[in-house]
Design a protein with these regions (language model features):
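N-terminal Rossmann NAD(P)H-binding glycine-rich loop of SDR-like oxidoreductase domains
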Residues: 4-26, 33
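NAD(P)H-binding glycine-rich loop region in Rossmannoid oxidoreductase-like domains
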Residues: 38, 46-99, 104-106, 118-122
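SDR active-site strand-loop-helix element
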Residues: 9, 33, 78-79, 112-118, ...
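A hydrophobic C-terminal alpha-helical subdomain
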Residues: 246-309
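Substrate-positioning beta->alpha
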Residues: 160-161, 179-202, 211
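Glycine/proline-rich active-site loop of Rossmann-fold NAD(P)-dependent oxidoreductases
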Residues: 156-164, 200-213, 236-237
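Substrate-binding strand-loop-helix patch
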Residues: 182-191, 213-232, 242-253, 291-294
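Conserved beta-loop-beta element that borders a ligand/cofactor-binding pocket
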Residues: 137-167
C-alpha cells in the first residue's frame, strides 16, 4: 500500500481524532489545518516525527490552504456543527465551506471525501439537515472524483450523545422523550466508521467513487429504545416524560441561547426525520470483511461510569 498525503479538515473533532490516529498508524502523512494547533497534540503523539503537519486555518480564509490542497493526494472534510453561533452558521459550515474546498480539490484534480449526515434533505424545516443536503448536492453536481459518507448517530467512548443521556440519569428522575421517542436511528460505532473511511482512502475500488454512501450500524433503534438501553446499562429504573411538541420547541429555543446548548429548536425539527438506511450496513461489512459492532455491547463498557456507587 502506497503511503498518501492526506489533508483532513476537522481533525480535532470526535471522528477526526479517531481517523487521524488510524491513518497515522498506517504510515500516511497528514496535513491538519486547525484553528487551535494545541488541539492536535494527542494526534501528534500517535505518529512519527514529521508525519503530521499542523497548519493554522480559519473558515473565513479558506483559500489559505489551496497550496496544501495542491500538495495532497486526498482531501477529507469532516467539518460540521450541531448548533449555530453568530460567527458560524449551518449554511457557512455545511454548504459554503465544502463548496469552496470541493472547487479547489477539483481544480487540482484531487480526490475529495466529504462526511455529511444521514437524513439530509431539502424537504425539511431543519436548517441543519437542509444545509447538509445543499453541500452534498453541490459536490455531486460539480466534482468529478468524490465520495460522500452519510453516517447516522456515531457512538464511541467520547461521544456527546449516549454520554449526555447517561450523565442525565445521575441527576434527573426521568429522561425526556421528544416526538414520543419514535424517531429511528441506525447508530454506527466510531471505530467502524473510521475504519470504513480509511478503507476508502486506501482503495481504488470504483464502488466508492462518485457515490453517496449511507454509513450505518447493524441495528435500528427508536429514540426511546436507545434511552431504555442506557437505563439498563446504568442499572436504573426506566422513567420517561413525554414532552409535547409545543413545549419541546419552546425548550429548544430557550436552550439554544446557551453557549453550548444540550438541545436546540433545530434539533427538535430534525427529530421529524428518521436516520436509518436498512441494509446499508451490509455494504460496509463487505468492505471491511467483518461484522459491525453492536451498540449495546460497546456502550456497556463506557457507560458503566454512570452507575451509582454503593
Amino acid at each position: 500500500m502506497k503511503n498518501k498525503n492526506i489533508l483532513i479538515l476537522g481533525s480535532t473533532g470526535f471522528i477526526g481524532r479517531s481517523l487521524t490516529k488510524k491513518l497515522l498508524s498506517k504510515g500516511h502523512h497528514i496535513t491538519s489545518p486547525v484553528r487551535n494547533p494545541d488541539k492536535v497534540k494527542r494526534n501528534i503523539l500517535s505518529g512519527d516525527i514529521g508525519q503530521i503537519n499542523i497548519i493554522p486555518f480559519n473558515v473565513s480564509n479558506l483559500y489559505s490552504i489551496e497550496a496544501d490542497i495542491k500538495e495532497a493526494d486526498i482531501i477529507v472534510n469532516l467539518l460540521g456543527i450541531l448548533f449555530e453561533k453568530p460567527n458560524r452558521s449551518f449554511d457557512t459550515i455545511h454548504y459554503h465551506v465544502p463548496k469552496v474546498i470541493a472547487d479547489m480539490a477539483n481544480k487540482h484534480n484531487k480526490r475529495f471525501i466529504h462526511i455529511s449526515s444521514l437524513g439530509s434533505t431539502t424537504e425539511t424545516k431543519s436548517s441543519y439537515l437542509y444545509s447538509k443536503a445543499l453541500g452534498e448536492q453541490y459536490i455531486e453536481t460539480n466534482h468529478n472524483n468524490y465520495s460522500i459518507i452519510k453516517p447516522s448517530i456515531v457512538f464511541g467512548e467520547e461521544d456527546n450523545f449516549l454520554n449526555q443521556f447517561g450523565y442525565m440519569t445521575k441527576f434527573l428522575p426521568f429522561l425526556p422523550l421528544y416526538k414520543k421517542g419514535n424517531t429511528k436511528f441506525q447508530p454506527i460505532y466510531l471505530d467502524d466508521l473510521t475504519s470504513f473511511i480509511s478503507e476508502i482512502i486506501d482503495s481504488d475500488d470504483s464502488n466508492f467513487l462518485n457515490k453517496s454512501i449511507d454509513a450505518v450500524g447493524p441495528n435500528i433503534y427508536s429514540f426511546k429504545e436507545i434511552l431504555e438501553m442506557i437505563f439498563e446499562i446504568v442499572k436504573k429504573k426506566k422513567r420517561f416524560i413525554n414532552i409535547p411538541d409545543f413545549f419541546a420547541s419552546l425548550q429548544g429555543r430557550l436552550m439554544g441561547a446557551l453557549p453550548n446548548p444540550p438541545f436546540t429548536y433545530d434539533q427538535f425539527l430534525s427529530l421529524s426525520h428518521d436516520s436509518i438506511s436498512p441494509g446499508a450496513d451490509k455494504f460496509i461489512e463487505a468492505s471491511l470483511g467483518r461484522e459491525l459492532s453492536s451498540m449495546k455491547l460497546v456502550a456497556s463498557n463506557y457507560l458503566k461510569k454512570f452507575i451509582d456507587k454503593v
